[in-house]
Amino acid sequence: SLFFYSYFPIPPQQTHEAGVFLREIAKRLLVGLENKLPDLQDRINHIFTKQLFGIAITRLTSLLSRRSLYCSKTADGKYSICDCFTNNDGNVKFDNIKHTWNEDLRCQFCGVSQTQETYKRTDMEVFAYQFIHTYNPEEIFNMKFDVIIGNPPYQFNVGNTSGNSSKAKAIYHLFVQQAKKMQPRYLSMIIPSRWMTRSTEGIPDEWVDDM
């Protein structure tokens, strides 16, 4: 999952899957903004609608993240502690998008093969993660973010039957690339360190050099 955070006041201009990062940031903001926004409900509404945003990697993790953050799986639900959302998602997005296939029958964004049933099925999620399946990640929320925190999926087990995880196709570097495009002041991603050895399948040398 990916989590986005803007400071208060917002300057001119993705926890793990259960939304823990967002929840812990919210707890600190509730304390830190007490003098600026003394009314608790006003403070909650401001933090959840103006400062904290997330992208879930599956529908299930979107529901878990909203429950962790808003105390309700729907942001505008009866039990949500934020009382000004007018949609189910709030600021925790999940869109079940599809892969975009090129002439080689591979996704032009993440590189998975159309020959694998998991990624071309129409009735279930296909793991076309929204953040990396766009050329313009900044348009997902149309905002400038000060901080981006992520715990992205590490890899696709594409044709890997050896049990050697280093031979699976890495995708975590794509999340780092997209986050850097958004030019946050701070970027923190939980990713494996294997890229340093240049031995991970799918990670180009150019990306390692840039890191």
PLM regions: where:
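SAM-dependent methyltransferase catalytic region
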Residues: 1-211
